Regions:
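Short, flexible loop segments at the rims of nucleotide/cofactor-binding pockets, characterized by
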Residues: 9-11, 47-50, 67-72
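Structural motif corresponding to alpha-helix initiation and N-cap regions
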Residues: 15-18, 54-55, 73-80
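Short, surface-exposed acidic-centric catalytic microdomains
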Residues: 20, 28-64
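Short acidic amphipathic segments
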Residues: 58-76
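Proline-aspartate-enriched helix->loop->beta-strand connector
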Residues: 81-91
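Conserved small/polar residues in nucleotide/adenosyl-binding loops
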Residues: 92-97
């Protein structure tokens, strides 16, 4: 089974995110999306973010038909551990979706 991985804040979902997930689905059998915790977003982007809390963002991501698994991470070490655990064949980013 080929696993495609992407991660990000996904705070305010927009059509570009949906396109990212749709293309990710076309590239593999399973799509895993990891999203930052609220604490990580505040640390990285300031106290005014995220607009939507983690529970809301996870629920929105879980409702998208192109996504199989939604995970959360609080720091880079945790993210790297999850990537190692799931061993995706492809790490897919929004930069790749623009190409």
């Amino acid at each position: 089974m080929s696993i495609v991985w992407t991660n990000g804040t996904f705070d305010i979902l927009h059509p570009g995110h949906i396109q990212l997930f749709k293309v990710a689905r076309s590239l593999g059998d399973k799509v895993i999306v990891a999203t930052d915790t609220d604490e990580k977003i505040k640390k990285d982007k300031g106290d005014y973010k995220p607009f939507n809390d983690l529970c809301y963002r996870v629920a929105m991501l879980e409702a998208i038909k192109y996504i199989d698994v939604v995970l959360t991470f609080g720091d880079r070490k945790e993210l790297e551990g999850l990537i190692q655990l799931y061993s995706p064949c492809l790490l897919y980013t929004s930069d790749a979706a623009d190409e």
